[in-house]
């Protein structure tokens, strides 16, 4: 049998005139892209366009089938389209998407993991190049002691600054409905039926860490009805927000609901006199970041990232398994993260080898995981998995949130990857604190929000809100300047 690492066309391992390799989707065979006859290459995004030149980057290749199969050789590529003097990818380009994403992947350079192992040489679509490094780092930092019961977690919430696995998730308040399946677990098929096959989802290609535009029907066919060895690529859905989906009864943990800063301050202006004659923003929807469904196939990998605004995260595994590798937001780790984010060759560096004080946690079906603000983390999926999770800002982590937002600006994170309406949330918080509204709230379980806000946090909030680029029109103060003055008066 021929060595699959030898090009089937030129019979060479190394060909100076053909540096880009591609692996067959259906077998281990590798070939040089430039050895494939042009007549066997087709564009995925153009229906009637003759291919006159070879792809010049592994990122342009969508799929490949080698001559060993009866269907014949066939390479599918993305066409690069020139428009108004600029080279642009077609409409499948994830840069065209304007839906808020949870994770602030950098705009500096699209990650090209496809050709990482050998520059632009070989392209294995079923194994992420960082998988081995991730597993080594996971074993190094493996942690079995960060566990806590739900009652203690809720009671100690303000003082918690490390990730915890909740040992009694059934007592946490998190709720995922049982459905009419064999084991009663929520499934991708059920979610598709509830939301609709035509509903848009952003699907991440694990190798390139880039998003593609799919509908739920196509995703369900890929996830539910395609055997793992028949999948053309490893893919991941991590940004399906479902808080507004009727009939999908999901409930967040009690500790999350009690400490979600947006929930506390978003609508309070409606109960106070408006000195500007403005109406409260009753019809202004809250940021939708509270309930996500995450669907990942075996070997899916999400590279190191910060959730937008460094939000805290709750993470309930419905089915499958997850491996988390997390690093705290120490100044040293943050500095290294910024440096890595700004590197042109960041895809060649496994950040976990550089960061310090790691925590590695393995999650199984039924587990509930709580991540505090600012943790830099990567996630690996050993088996097909379905997860219910979400993000939330807290008064506990206000300084961290503000710090991460500045890092997002420094590293030029696209707006759609940032926390929606963050400046508006901060403005409302300023009014809430300045007016000390929490003292007259009817919900005594809220506690005294102002007393939970440190002087340092108020100083950081004041420094943020007075920036000219932060736009907010107060409802209870004549101007942002007067609001800032009232906030400054709180600092003792």
UniProtKB/Swiss-Prot annotation:
Cofactor(s) this protein requires: Fe(2+)
EC code(s) of this entry: 1.14.11.27
One Gene Ontology cellular component annotation held by this UniProt entry: nucleus
Disulfide cross-links: none
Subcellular location: Nucleus
Predominant subcellular localization, coarse grouping: nucleus
UniProt-annotated binding residues for Fe cation: 305, 307, 377
Origin: domain of life: Eukaryota
ZnF start-end (PHD-type): 4-72
Cofactor binding: number and manner: Binds 1 Fe(2+) ion per subunit.
One GO biological process term: chromatin remodeling
Positions annotated to bind substrate: 302, 322
Single annotated GO MF: zinc ion binding
Domain JmjC span(s) in chain numbering: 254-409
Record field: catalytic activity: N(6),N(6)-dimethyl-L-lysyl(36)-[histone H3] + 2 2-oxoglutarate + 2 O2 = L-lysyl(36)-[histone H3] + 2 formaldehyde + 2 succinate + 2 CO2
Keywords: Chromatin regulator, Dioxygenase, Iron, Metal-binding, Nucleus, Oxidoreductase, Transcription, Transcription regulation, Zinc, Zinc-finger
Its job: Histone demethylase that specifically demethylates 'Lys-36' of histone H3, thereby playing a central role in histone code. Does not demethylate H3 'Lys-4' nor 'Lys-79'.
Recorded domain comment: The JmjC domain mediates the demethylation activity.
UniProt family annotation: Belongs to the JHDM1 histone demethylase family.
Other known facts: Present with 784 molecules/cell in log phase SD medium.
Name this polypeptide is given: JmjC domain-containing histone demethylation protein 1
Lineage, highest ranks first: Eukaryota, Fungi, Dikarya, Ascomycota, Saccharomycotina
């Amino acid at each position: 049998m021929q060595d699959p690492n030898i090009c089937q066309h030129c019979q060479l391992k190394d060909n100076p005139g053909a540096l880009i390799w591609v692996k067959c989707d259906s077998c281990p065979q590798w070939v040089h892209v430039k050895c494939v006859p042009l007549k066997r290459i087709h564009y995925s995004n153009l229906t009637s366009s003759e291919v006159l030149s070879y792809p010049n980057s592994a990122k342009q290749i969508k799929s490949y089938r080698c001559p060993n199969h009866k269907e014949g050789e066939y390479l599918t590529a993305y066409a690069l389209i020139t428009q108004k003097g600029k080279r642009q990818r077609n409409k499948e380009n994830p840069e065209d998407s304007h839906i808020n994403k949870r994770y602030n992947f950098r705009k500096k350079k699209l990650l090209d993991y496809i050709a990482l192992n050998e520059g632009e040489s070989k392209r294995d679509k079923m194994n992420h190049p960082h998988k081995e490094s991730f597993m080594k780092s996971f074993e190094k930092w493996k942690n079995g002691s960060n566990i806590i019961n739900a009652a203690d977690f809720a009671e100690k919430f303000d003082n918690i600054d490390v990730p915890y696995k909740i040992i009694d998730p059934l007592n946490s308040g998190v709720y995922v409905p049982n459905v009419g399946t064999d084991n009663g677990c929520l499934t991708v098929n059920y979610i598709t039926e509830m939301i609709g096959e035509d509903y848009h989802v952003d699907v991440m290609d694990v190798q390139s860490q880039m998003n593609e535009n799919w509908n739920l029907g196509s995703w369900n066919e890929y996830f539910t009805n395609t055997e793992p060895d028949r999948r053309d690529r490893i893919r991941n859905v991590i940004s399906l927000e479902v808080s507004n989906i009727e009939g999908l009864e999901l409930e967040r943990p009690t500790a999350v609901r009690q400490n979600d800063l947006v929930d506390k301050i978003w609508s309070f202006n409606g109960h106070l006199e408006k000195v500007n004659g403005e109406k409260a923003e009753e019809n202004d929807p809250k940021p939708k970041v509270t309930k996500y469904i995450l669907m990942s196939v075996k070997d899916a990998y999400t590279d190191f990232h910060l959730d937008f605004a460094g939000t805290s995260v709750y993470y309930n595994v419905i089915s499958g398994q997850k491996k988390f590798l997390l690093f705290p937001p120490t100044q040293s780790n943050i500095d290294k993260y910024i440096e890595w984010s700004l590197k042109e060759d960041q895809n060649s560096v496994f950040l976990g080898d550089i960061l310090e004080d790691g925590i590695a946690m393995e999650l199984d079906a039924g587990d509930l995981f709580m991540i505090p603000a600012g943790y830099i983390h990567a996630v690996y999926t050993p088996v097909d998995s379905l997860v219910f999770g979400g993000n939330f800002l807290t008064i506990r982590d206000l300084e961290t949130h503000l710090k991460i937002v500045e890092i997002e600006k420094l590293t030029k994170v696209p707006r759609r990857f940032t926390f929606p309406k963050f400046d508006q949330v901060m403005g409302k918080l300023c009014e809430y604190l300045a007016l000390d509204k929490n003292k007259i709230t009817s919900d005594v379980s809220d506690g005294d929000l102002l007393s939970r806000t440190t002087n340092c946090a108020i100083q950081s909030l004041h420094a943020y809100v007075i920036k000219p680029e932060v736009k907010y029109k107060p409802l209870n103060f004549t101007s942002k300047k007067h609001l800032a003055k009232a906030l400054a008066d709180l600092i003792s």
